[in-house]
């Protein structure tokens, strides 16, 4: 199957840090279909060869399992081409059409690695130029809008040109191997699903922590914040994966129907729960890995009096028979004490204790997403001392490291998702109604913050966020995993 993959924003950060390395890995693994072209599109004045040289130079600064040899990159570079184009200029679209006519492809993928403000413009100009066709697919990066209203406007503009089956709204967390293994763990094994219910689970925690700051994205981040950047998409998609009912089959819409039910079952916010169950923070100066780092307001491109949040922690509940009364805790932030992303399922203690164990202790299942990729099951076993007579239990853990088990060059998130787009598989992509429900649920939080004169709570860089985050979960008698 021949394909054209058109990367708009072809000289941008996302393309050289994530997309090109993923495409190279797919090429190295022999997964890219033969007869394909990868066309970078940007406003820079570059030749094909100059673009290839630019990508090669950038490969020295990205994560790859193994550096490409000159011969290996040369073979990959044979697929790379470049087109100078301004998406906002209607006069440039005939040049795009000419580029597509150079290569008759079975599938044409339009990947918009650009600012969301250009999504509507691109679709309108594509339609005006008469260039939309059934073999086209469009990939949209998050954040898809700034609010429920803007999200609907973008989706409306895109659907005027593309059918829903042609639209791939990407959330790279869904491409992570551990997330896919969460589906396999739940729906491919009979062990856990009978316990996956309110009677056996005390709480579920979702953590997406970064130790880096905003790097060079000050202007973008200051207009976005952690709620829009991480919670509305990544965190809520992870919540859906862990809480959804078994789908009737493995087809895309069957999976997305069940995720939609979870989003629609989230308890709506009230003034009281907004005060008690939502914490926003902003990092101040501190120390990360022994090095002093500046506070958020001192970062380049950030308003010195900014109230943009770099940390969010919240408590939510799902109002259905499986999960009623079980608290779900979500937290995400920049400049935290470590880089990690995981889902922790905390089971209830044994109902009748005949052994001595830590007070209130229950089993835990931890699904690690990054940097580790694996599962840990925390159990209790009889202690080593006085084994013949002791009735004291000690914690033990079963550890499955997917990288060690299946090899360190497994398919990464973007590699998997890019191949899915080329092949037309929608299972790991987000449908428009899912996005709208997610925006509908987070919008009251944004509105309450806009009316709050106090702004975010300050936390020192290199810590786990504001103390109010720990106080929030402690009110339920629980604690975050790093302190339990």
What are these regions (language model features)?
Residues 1-139, 144-484:
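Secretory/organelle targeting and membrane-embedding segments
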